[in-house]
């Protein structure tokens, strides 16, 4: 489940799905605008992807409202987080990870962040993230 403004996080999301499929999972790429809390129980594990926006925060118009709605369903759910950023040091991801832990989510692996467009290392890390959810 992802939101992407420039296509960078969408590229990462595609790599996550590819990694999950290579590991034997049935995986679906879903835009944040098409996902909601009522769908959480349909999935054994979920990767959430959102770039850093503004002052190192989640995208506020689509992704954050969707994710906030899902928070009550995170307890005991295996998840992974990923996203791109233009500047900063990844504070948005650390804050997001803390929120997920406080909500009782099980982080399946280290989160993946990359600056701007994902390079080969970031694509590989996203594929590994997808596989870790299987």
Regions found by a protein language model. Give the residues of each.
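Short hydrophobic segments within beta-strands
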Residues: 1-3, 82
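FMN-binding flavodoxin-like domain, especially the glycine-rich phosphate-binding loop
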Residues: 8-11, 15-134
